[in-house]
């Protein structure tokens, strides 16, 4: 077969570090592509005006901006004396859930629940020179910057907690469920008390961090390099019904097997996959960019550019 595996090399020279074969075989095993084809053929044999079709398609997508300088992000984290945490990053929340993931990063680093973390809207006064929220990289870049800022504050807090709980080293300490843990056992020192004690000792409870994706490069002259931090893989099986008399169609189902990696939030990631499916269907079936003879964009409004709506959503997404 011609599916990417870890022996292959992309046109830019970067070697594949994982493969698409797993998602293909697991998708086929879960949904039985051969049986779905059989069902479509049986339907078509007895239907005069409607026809069903089914296709199986793999995908491989590199994560990072190919313009290397864009692969950087900053985060500003404040811990207040009441124990609350504020985070600012360059990521723009537009319904895709990136702020939820960033809040999860801070909450995990400080051993808090999400109610204790507030992610503020993007503001160039707090976070300057931001990279675009695009290329499926916003959560990676800004989440990592948030992690780095939280780690710096946490280490300073551990230096205070070390004496309060009589730990031999800060390496023996952790923050879980609002308490300091020593050697994985909960102590009586809670988060708010630790923060206040640190403040009284004039410890810095704020941090600005900068993250740049390591190990990536791309030469636009030779079109060679290592432009992506990693690749994600997936496979989709799509079934459609075409009304041959009226020239209409419906998407009956989309069945996916996608590489999530270690998902921070499966609900957000499922939503991203479902949204991507509908966007892809729109791109392939109805969206068309039209320019006139003078080069002016004519499809510049919803009245001239058709985008997917509720009726475009597949009947089943699995």
Q: Where do the model's predicted regions map?
A:
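C-terminal catalytic domains of large/alpha subunits in multi-subunit enzymes
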Residues: 1-59, 104-318
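Conserved strand-to-helix beginnings and helix N-cap segments that scaffold or border functional pockets
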Residues: 99-100
């Amino acid at each position: 077969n011609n599916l990417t595996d870890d022996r292959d090399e992309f046109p830019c020279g970067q070697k594949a570090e994982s493969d698409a074969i797993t998602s293909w075989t697991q998708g086929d095993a879960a949904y039985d592509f051969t049986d779905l084809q059989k069902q479509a053929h049986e339907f078509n044999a007895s239907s005069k005006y409607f026809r069903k079709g089914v296709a199986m398609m793999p995908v491989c997508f590199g994560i990072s901006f190919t313009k290397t300088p864009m692969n950087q992000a900053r985060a500003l984290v404040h811990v207040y004396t009441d124990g609350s945490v504020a985070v600012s990053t360059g990521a723009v929340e537009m319904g895709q859930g990136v702020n939820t993931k960033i809040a999860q990063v801070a909450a995990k680093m400080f051993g808090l629940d999400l109610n204790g973390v507030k992610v503020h809207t993007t503001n160039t006064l707090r976070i300057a020179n931001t990279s675009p929220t695009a290329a499926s990289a916003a959560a990676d870049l800004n989440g990592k910057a948030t992690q780095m800022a939280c780690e710096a504050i946490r280490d300073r807090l551990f230096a205070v907690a070390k004496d309060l709980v009589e730990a031999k080293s800060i390496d023996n300490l952790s923050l879980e469920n609002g308490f300091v843990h020593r050697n994985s056992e909960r102590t009586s020192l809670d988060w708010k008390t630790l923060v206040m004690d640190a403040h009284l000792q004039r410890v810095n409870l704020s941090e600005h961090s900068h993250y740049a994706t390591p190990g990536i490069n791309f030469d636009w002259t030779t079109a060679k390099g290592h432009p992506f931090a990693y690749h994600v893989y997936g496979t989709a099986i799509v079934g459609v019904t075409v009304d041959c008399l009226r020239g209409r169609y419906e998407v009956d189902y989309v069945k996916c097997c996608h590489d999530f990696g270690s998902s921070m939030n499966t609900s957000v990631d499922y939503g991203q996959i479902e949204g991507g499916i509908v966007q892809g269907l729109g791109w392939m079936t109805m969206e068309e960019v039209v320019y006139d003879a003078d080069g002016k964009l004519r499809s510049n409004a919803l009245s001239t550019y058709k985008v997917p709506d509720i009726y475009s959503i597949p009947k089943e997404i699995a």
